[in-house]
Amino acid sequence: MATSILGEEPRFGTTPLAMLAATCNKIGNTSPLTTLPESSAFAKGGFHPWKRSSSSCNLGSSLSGFAVATGGRGSGSLAGGSGAANSAFCLASTSPTSSAFSSDYGGLFSNSAAAAAAAAGVSPQEAGGQSAFISKVHTTAADGLYPRVGMAHPYESWYKSGFHSTLAAGEVTNGAASSWWDVHSSPGSWLEVQNPAGGLQSSLHSGAPQASLHSQLGTYNPDFSSLTHSAFSSTGLGSSAAAASHLLSTSQHLLAQDGFKPVLPSYSDSSAAVAAAAASAMISGAAAAAAGGSSARSARRYSGRATCDCPNCQEAERLGPAGASLRRKGLHSCHIPGCGKVYGKTSHLKAHLRWHTGERPFVCNWLFCGKRFTRSDELQRHLRTHTGEKRFACPVCNKRFMRSDHLSKHIKTHNGGGGGKKGSDSDTDASNLETPRSESPDLILHDSGVSAARAAAAAAAAAAAAAAAASAGGKEAATGPNDS
């Protein structure tokens, strides 16, 4: 194998990885570079990694060797193929780490490669050739030409701490490796929250949860161990099922230690005591509010009467117990000099005061209207002009009107008043004027009786005038022929 590696001309394939391995072989070789084969060799042969002259290696055997070295189930499949399957190309494909990594673990490469070759039925001479080729691949010249090959592997520290066969399990747990992936027994990261109680934190790291984690992750150990054994057996990074389970358990330990620690201390005894105290305070406050509910309602009712600032309420407040008679009357007068209007409710007084201040808080929300009014009943009456509603109906002719004053004018026409007919059928809104007084049905009937009496008197006067005129005409007719 060593003779074929050093002295035989390589046959190039079409993949970049094959070209890379061949170029590295040429760099380490002391003989002058050989010329490339004809273009027909690329079309005929396909990919043949350094096959012997005595035996022919097809594409399937080389690919099977590559699959075993990267993700196979075990090293036992190496014995089923030819010696070319366990080739230097497989070693180069499974060791993309830096030259520093290979120099640190140079002795381990040769030992583990010899052990893997013995397990697969390969002679020690071939294993020595493999180690010689590894020393050729990881050189400073290769780092200069191909910087990606010489770049430090992003998971180099992970390989060292998790899969190296010479590291003890205690070194990983004690924090011997100084990488971000390692799990330490006492991490000092920013995610950690110190708990003064300590009892809850110690329960997380006890032996029972760790045992349960190992039992839960036991189903993943066979697949994981076979994967790591086949992938890293030729590079000296092979590990057993115990190391794989230890890696999984430490990752779960990281989740339990750093992920859930900031959440769990919030449920400590001190916070629970604070929550219980707050709950008891709320319950006691609710009980006190329920006990003094009637007194609070009475106090609100009494204080509501004292909120009015009219002269009558201020006088009753000043007099104290002597002003009880003023409070019983419940009269609220306007404080504007010269007004003197009195109302029985504070809301009516407030509505009246808007006339003095010019405040108009009630706005018509009809489209493109936007008129403002002082009182809500004015706004409701104005809205009837938009909707066309006529609430007031005539009892005689059943004619309907929007406003009560319009109805009263219309009733006068039925009683023979005549003078109030002008504008009686007008439905125009006078909302910009002061609100008219509300007319009761008794007042409407009284007005109609007065108008009827006036009409009767007018009719009697007209009849008397007609009788007088008739009598005067008769006298003239009687004296006329005598004069002639």
Swiss-Prot record:
Protein name as catalogued: Transcription factor Sp9
Region (Disordered): 409-446
SMART domains given in the database record: ZnF_C2H2
Protein family: Belongs to the Sp1 C2H2-type zinc-finger protein family.
Residue positions of motif 9aaTAD: 178-186
InterPro entries: Znf_C2H2_sf (IPR036236), Znf_C2H2_type (IPR013087)
A family per Pfam: zf-C2H2
Phosphoserine: residues bearing it: 440
Zinc finger (C2H2-type): 332-356, 362-386, 392-414
Keyword Metal-binding: yes
Gene name of this polypeptide: Sp9
Domain of life, per lineage: Eukaryota
GO biological process: embryonic limb morphogenesis
Natural source organism: Mus musculus (Mouse)
Keyword flag Phosphoprotein: yes
